[in-house]
């Protein structure tokens, strides 16, 4: 594995670690990168598989500007994810990451990347359908989003 020296990004540390560098440099994490618009049981199911194996999760929220497909700010999304996992006592760290789309992210700096393809029987959950269901005042979406964050999702979508 090659090592690349990089200057510390103080903005990242300030936003994600209160200005302090992380002390978890030797800890291995299962890393999940996404938009989470909103965070739903499909996301939770994948992450829970790693947590059940005793592997802590690092959930990285892509730092994107809100738009029709992304109605929640990065900060709102992070708070919802933190709220859910705090209610469960999960070993989860949530942080933002600059917007990326390449699955190759991290390979160039020597990280070991193990891609995970979810099993086909896990089902497909569409965040777009969840947002549309809320806009249409249809409660079908409630079976797809954990009760601990449902009120936040509705409030943020209806008060934007």
Give the positions of each predicted feature.
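Nucleotidyltransferase catalytic core that binds NTPs
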Residues: 2-160
């Amino acid at each position: 594995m090659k090592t690349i020296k990089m200057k510390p990004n103080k903005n990242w540390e300030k936003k994600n670690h209160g200005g302090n560098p992380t002390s978890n440099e030797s800890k291995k994490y299962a890393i999940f990168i996404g938009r989470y618009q909103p965070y739903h049981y499909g996301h939770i199911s994948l992450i829970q598989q790693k947590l059940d194996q005793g592997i802590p999760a690092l959930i990285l929220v892509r730092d994107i500007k809100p738009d029709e497909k992304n109605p929640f700010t990065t900060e709102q999304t992070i708070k919802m994810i933190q709220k859910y996992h705090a209610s469960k006592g999960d070993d989860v760290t949530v942080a933002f990451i600059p917007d990326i789309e390449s699955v190759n992210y991290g390979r160039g700096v020597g990280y070991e990347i193990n891609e995970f393809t979810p099993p086909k029987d896990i089902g497909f959950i569409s965040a777009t359908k969840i947002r549309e269901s809320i806009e249409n005042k249809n409660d079908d979406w409630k079976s797809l989003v954990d009760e601990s964050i449902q009120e936040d999702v509705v409030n943020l979508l209806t008060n934007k």
